[in-house]
Amino acid sequence: MSSALAVEGIDVFYDASQILFGVDLAMRAGEIVALLGRNGAGKSTTFKAIAGIAPPRRGRVRFGERDLAGLPPHRIARAGIGYVPEDRQVFPEHSVEDNLAIGAKPGPAGQRFWTISTVYEVLPELHRLRARAAGRLSGGEQQMLTIARALMGNPDLLLLDEPTEGLAPVVVERIMALLHRLRTMGMTVLLAEQNMFFCVDVADEIVIIDKGQIVHRDTAERLSQDEEIKRRYLAV
Amino acid sequence: MNLDAFAGCLSSASCLITQTSAGLIIGMLLFLVACGVTLIFGVLGVINFAHGAFYMLGAYLALTAYQLTDSYLAAVLCAAAGVGLFGVAFDRLFMSRVYNSNVLMQLLVCYAFVLILDDAVKMIWGAEFQSMGMPAVFALRPLHVFGGLVPPFYVFLVAVTVAIAIALGGLIERTLFGKIVRAAAVNRQMVSALGINTSLLYASVFGLGALLAGAAGALAAPVRSATPGMGVSILIESFIVTVIGGMGSIAGAFTAAVLLGLVRSFGSIGFPLFTDGLMFGLMVIVLLIRPQGLFARGSA
Amino acid sequence: MTAHLAIADLVKHFGGVVATDHVTLDFPPGSLTAVIGPNGAGKSTLFNLITGRIRPDGGQVLLDGADIAGLAETAIVARGIGRAFQIASLFPSFTVAESLAAAILAHRRQTHRMLTRFPLAAARGRADEVMHLVGLDAHADRLAQHLSHGDQKLLDIALALALDPGVLLLDEPTAGMGRDERWQIIETVHRLWSARRMTMIFIEHDMDIVFKIAQSVRVLKYGRVLAEGTPAEIRDNDEVIAAYLGARYAKAAP
Amino acid sequence: MLALLACVLTLLIASALGSKPLIDTLMRLAIFGLYAVSLNILVGYTGLVSFGHAMFFGFGAYAFGLLMQTGVTSLPAAALASLALSAALALIVGALCIRLADIYFSFLTLAFQMLLHAVILSWVSLTGGDQGLQGGIPRPRFLGINLADPWQVFVVTTVVFFASLLAIRTILQSPFGYALRMVRDNAPRAAALGLPVQRYKLAAFVIAGLFGALAGILMALYVSGAYPNFAFWTLSGEGMFMIMLGGIGVFLGPVLGAAIFLLLNDTVTRFTEYNGMVMGVVLLVVVLGLRQGLLDVVMARLRPR
Amino acid sequence: MVDSGFGRPVFGSPGRRSVLKAGLVAGATLSMPFVARGASKQPIRIGQPSILSGRLAQLGISSRNAAQMVVDAFNAAGGLDGRTIELISRDSKGKPDEAARVVRELINNDGCQIILDSEASSGAFAVQEVVRETGTLCIHADSETTSLTADPKIRAPNAFRCARQVLHDSIVGGSYAAGIAKAQGLKRWMTCSPDYVYGRDSSSEFLDYLKMFEPSVEAVGATWPKLFAPDYTENVTRILETKPQALYSALYSGDLVSFIDQGNLYGLFDQVKFFAINMADYTTLHAVKKLPAGIYSCNRYLSTFPATKSNAEWSAAYDKRYNVLPLNWAWQNALAMQFLVEAIKKTGSDDGKVLAGALRGMTVESPFGAKGTVTMRAEDQTIVDYAIGWGVTIPQAPFVEGMQAADWTVIAARETEWKKQKGWA
């Protein structure tokens, strides 16, 4: 597993307002890293910068051998980055299966591990719902669908932006299980979360972002013990 | 106004059949042009004011191809392909630069091309009107259907148009390309983030719309003489269709085109001097009551 | 103490989603209140309901005891509720001074005048005052679109202030700013509040700021009021901590 | 003051040169300049992209011509009556159109314009149909002014033009004008400041319609007739062309745009019948190259940040 | 200098003012090239506003071609004591206001002493108003609308018309059609003409004279396609529905071709006798790929009618030079220019008033005359005795046969009567 992500000192602006201030973030292949922070801390913007939707004004996004910063989103996706946005963004009038079909493509090395059938195998509820319009799914089902849609692109790295937001605990558990399964399959995952305990459960390492800057990084176990950090950056 | 004639026609079977079929025929030709407008708007959000000029280009290309090959099929294919390619180039070189600008900019780029293409056609093909003439296969006597008259060429036109409508509907509804196109219409960014080159997608949709306009020009060539500037009236009518049907809806365009065809065919009996006014009046009413059109974002 | 602004049993649906779920809150005169909550908690919707940008499906919005729910936005503004936006909402082609003068004239219903030159002297004097209040004097003749992000946020607040509102709603006044800029703007806000004692309500994600300046805090989650109290009370409220750290896992956590 | 000065100066230069072509050019410039400025009240200052502004140009020209031909003996009375009728039309059409947003607003204005065009073509007994109002427009003397004399028509046109510019400018520089800009820049924000946005849109529509009609009246005087293409969509398109060429962000931009448009048109038609080709290319260069009008570019350069 | 109140100049800043001024100066210089013109042996300038672009471009082009041929011949023969004629054609794009502008420009700017107006009717009325004001000598060569010279309110002493007239055509058409109606028993008539003034006048006057010459006919309906309509289906079916025995149409050019193409699909011309007044013009005859035999048409222009040597030669010369056959507008402009040239030669002058005096009542020899000459009638300054005839189409050259020439004494009598009715005579 050679591919690894290295975000180096990116600044991101929306018009005049600066959202990210020199964000650095590195991860190894096969790792699950959680980007933890409160509302408005810059998690989603970091993801959009990596995915090419909000290109950084400064800094680099190294993925494997290449610098992806400034490439259009589709080139970044083809380089092997699968993006699951925070508000899910399913195609609401399309059926579940059509949503998956739109996401289908071989991976950067031509691999076609994830197909409709392998996805249905891992997420059988999608098979049951395959003909339903995505806009009529529940929040949890939509979340499953967007993850599955990203997997259909056979990515080397999965960007999961707040996959548990607004979901019932039972659904959060399902997603947790899915992530554990993906880990065993060797998938590299970068996760954005507000939910500390979810992160502790699934992530190898946790990176804390606050006010557009990375402020802390540690293993999940150690961080979960650190009351000061928790209170300072995460709790109220 | 001639309400007696209107009532008289409504109570005569042959008149009803003839006028209804006439309305259908008019509607089909309108649909052929309008579906490109609505497709391009539905996906790209761009109002292609140059569409009438594409139609004109199609008619002229068909004329030349027909003269060279003596084959109507070749003429239609050549016109469709030629105008389609032109549309792709037009999108890539010009329109794509103003996708993110306001409507005014897009309008002016198209307007510029209407002016340029009208003159270009005059330079290349001359100012005189030209007529292709009816291909021998269609030079047949009209069919009698329940006392009404229906020309075979129009049967062919209606069949082709319905086939195109079904194919287009199928392409948009059933194929992966169509699914991606519809998804891009809703959320371009997400489609792009899934690894699809949306610039290319946009160009191909624009090309497809242009191809349909070219095909319409070629299909109409046997019965409509070609002159520089012939696109204008067609453009205006196809806008009425698009607006009434709902911008972006293929099914809406189809319905509105037939509706407008019927307004024209029956209007010519009841209100022979004001059919244009009827069409614009209908557009005003629809915009006031249901500005998004009768079939807002139906099938496309 | 009667509330300056009170919300009673307010309800708003968007399609099948309940954005505001029987919310009841009150804000005493001259209070400075922070509204916090996770994304999608209904904070901005609450502001939109108060200012009449969207109409509530049920419930009341009481300003000095009078129900203003369902009135037009312009009518509500006229009663003295000013508002600044999460993303600075400005008139890009206006200078700072022009923006404020225009806001003042709009509020005073003098914009129908066609033959006098803009701005009227009185409006100009008042605009100068407001500019001074928020510290934008130096930028009076710069176009709003050319201001720095922080100054744009200040101008947005100043536009609301120009109406001389009794109630001022600020939606994330520090969004999109660096550390130092945040404190500058928050100091300005606090200074305004303490100088003029208007009823001020602000939405904020930066807890340092919330705990530093707010008199009291309201926590929303999924369109409901989760908690209300002083900063100290909120800080120690288990439910609130759980809401932020994840409900199911709060108890499981060591 | 400045307008007065410019007006006198224009008249002096014109009378000194005594050149008929110059006078013709200036008259057309005044007519189309006023037309473009009136359209820019909507597009540039209120942010309402009307595709149907020629409706008022045509309506004004026809109303005036018809009133004069059917026996109104006083020319100013006919002009005022035409303006009143145009304002009433603008009020009705505007009230319906401003309810719609964006492109639907544009389409509805276009539809109304084409409806008027269809009426003009169909109502032959009144309008003369496609051949326009025939037989010239009578020009009885008033206040010692004899509009049968081209020089006096020129003087009146020039005075009306500068007076209108002054009036429009006064309106745009008034609190009302700034309210329109607020609507253009950020209508929701204007509403949040207490501005009744719809009412201001309607007022802008009526004022623009009024001055558009005034330009139409001047045109009817100039060509001594009225023609259906005054109310055709191409004239609306040319209005857009003019304001985009000159600049929508500067008050005199549309006048400059009209001047360039007319000079370009007149010059190009001298040398080639492929006028459309040249105009199209110029338009493309402006839209894709500059992306804004000439005066907008100049102003952007001049303005300190 | 006026300020906005916050120190930002908005109106009349020096930059913009100078831009505007520069524009005016540029305009003035551009508009006055004639200032530098020399005075000796200057050419006689004739300005020709016409439609050179858009759907009616061929009207302007054939007008220009034909007039230029006459000018070239005049100049080659030495002109007027060495003074040549310069023809300046300019495009009005078919817009009346633009036509008015072009005429003013030609007169004021290019120093044209004479206007050869080659506009369609709406443009011609606009030109009329300009020359009424300037007093410039003008010959309208393309407008067929009768009122242009017949209506005393509209006509002007310095304006002439050298073109066929709707009224003349209608009288001839009515009498010709009456003969056929009587012979074949055609009682039920219908019209299908373009929905604009020419089309309406032509239809109603044709029917009036048809009924006058053959009272047994009745008009059973009318359908009005709009000008430049792409589609005539509803009109064709309307006609089929009404089942007339004969159909009259004033459609022309591309519109007529489309109508015939679309009517053919329904077998329309097998079911009704078709009287298309504007059929017999070469582009139209050529453009119809399958010209139905038996369409009755008036001559627009035919090289075989009048069947004289001079007509055939003129047509051949035109064809040789421009590689296209001449149209109706061509003969009218050729004749108009011939009138001007002869008036210039006769008077030795280029003065409009002098020339106008010579033109009134002038008779010239012409291939287009009914009897070899055409006269510019003095009373209403319009041409008479030009060749009008009706015949029947055949699918191949010469396309029309059985031409019956009109009798100008009948035309003149009916015309006088008509003017009296209108109160114009």
Which residue ranges define each predicted feature?
Chain E
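Signal peptide-proximal N-terminal region
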Residues: 65-87, 212-215
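Extracellular/periplasmic periplasmic-binding protein-like sensory domains
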Residues: 156, 263-334, 345-348, 405-424
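N-terminal secretory signal peptides
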Residues: 1-18, 22, 27-29
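Solvent-exposed, acidic/polar segments of extracytosolic/periplasmic ligand-binding ectodomains
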Residues: 293, 363-425
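Extracellular/periplasmic Venus flytrap/periplasmic-binding protein
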Residues: 98-101, 146-147, 156-265, 304-313
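Periplasmic-binding protein-like
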Residues: 106, 110-119, 139-141, 190-192, ...
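Beta-alpha junction/loop-to-helix N-cap segments that form part of ligand/metal-binding clefts
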Residues: 58-65, 80-150, 162, 224-233, ...
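Extracytoplasmic "Venus flytrap"
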Residues: 47-66, 90-96, 119-120, 192-201, ...
